[in-house]
C-alpha cells in the first residue's frame, strides 16, 4: 500500500510539473523519471515510466526528453515507437541497451576517454533536435550517476562540471523559449555526497 501510494504520488507529480512548466516556464518534480520501465513491466528499479506518462497524458503536446542519466533511457526509447508525441534524446556513459529509433537518438560519451567538450556538444545537439521537431516541453533527466565518485561514473565528470551541465541546459531552454521541467535521476553515492549534487541542480535552475 505504501509503495502504491508513493508511485501514484510520483506520477501525479510528473503531470503537475508539466502543467507548471507551461505556466511558469520552468518546474521540477523531486522524483525520478523511471526511464528504464517499459510498457508491460518495470525494470532496473523503475516501476512506471513517468516520462512517457506525460506524453500519454498530453497527446496534443510534443514532449522531448533530454536524458542525462549515466544509463541510457532504454524504456523511454521503446515508448517512442508507439507514442508519436514523444522524443527521447539520451546522453549516457553506459549504454544499458538504449536503442535508436526514428524518435530516439543516443549519444555515448565514454566514461574513461570522453570529455566535457564532447558532452556539451551532445547537449547542443539535443536542443537542435528539439527545435527541429518543434517540442512543446523539454523534460530534463538530471542524472548524477555520471559523477566521477559514483560507481557508474565518468572519471572526468567533476562536481563543477555537473553544475556547468545543468546551467547549460537551463540557459539553452531559456534562450530557445522551451518550457522545461526537470526530474532527479541516477546517483549511487552515499546520501551525504549525493544530495548536494541534486541541490546544485536547483541552484543552477535559479541562477
Where are these regions (language model features)?
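Active-site neighborhoods of divalent-metal-dependent phosphate/nucleic-acid chemistry enzymes
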Residues: 1-7
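Conserved alpha-helical scaffold segments that buttress catalytic/binding sites
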Residues: 15, 19, 28-175, 199-203
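Active-site acidic/histidine proton-transfer and metal-coordination neighborhood
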Residues: 24
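A general structural signal for short secondary-structure boundary/capping elements
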Residues: 112, 185-186
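A short, acidic, flexible beta-alpha connecting loop/helix-capping segment that sits on the rim
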Residues: 146, 186-190
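Short acidic/histidine-rich active-site segments
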Residues: 179-184
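C-terminal active-site-proximal or functional interface alpha/beta core segments in diverse enzymes
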Residues: 189-207
Amino acid at each position: 500500500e505504501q509503495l502504491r501510494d508513493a508511485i501514484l504520488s510520483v506520477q501525479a507529480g510528473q503531470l503537475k510539473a508539466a502543467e507548471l512548466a507551461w505556466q511558469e516556464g520552468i518546474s521540477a518534480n523531486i522524483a525520478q523519471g523511471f526511464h528504464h520501465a517499459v510498457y508491460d513491466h518495470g525494470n532496473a528499479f523503475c516501476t512506471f515510466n513517468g516520462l512517457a506518462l506525460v506524453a500519454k497524458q498530453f497527446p496534443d503536446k510534443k514532449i522531448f526528453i533530454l536524458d542525462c542519466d549515466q544509463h541510457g533511457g532504454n524504456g523511454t526509447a521503446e515508448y517512442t515507437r508507439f507514442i508519436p508525441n514523444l522524443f527521447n534524446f539520451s546522453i549516457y556513459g553506459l549504454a544499458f541497451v538504449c536503442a535508436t529509433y526514428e524518435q530516439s537518438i543516443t549519444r555515448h560519451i565514454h566514461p574513461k576517454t570522453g570529455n566535457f567538450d564532447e558532452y556539451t556538444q551532445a547537449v547542443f545537439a539535443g536542443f537542435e533536435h528539439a527545435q527541429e521537431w518543434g517540442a512543446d516541453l523539454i523534460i530534463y533527466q538530471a542524472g548524477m550517476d555520471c559523477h566521477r565518485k559514483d560507481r557508474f561514473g565518468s572519471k572526468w565528470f567533476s562536481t563543477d562540471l555537473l553544475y556547468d551541465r545543468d546551467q547549460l541546459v537551463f540557459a539553452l531552454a531559456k534562450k530557445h523559449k522551451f518550457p522545461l521541467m526537470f526530474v532527479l535521476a541516477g546517483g549511487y553515492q552515499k546520501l551525504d555526497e549525493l544530495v548536494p549534487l541534486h541541490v546544485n541542480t536547483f541552484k543552477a535552475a535559479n541562477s
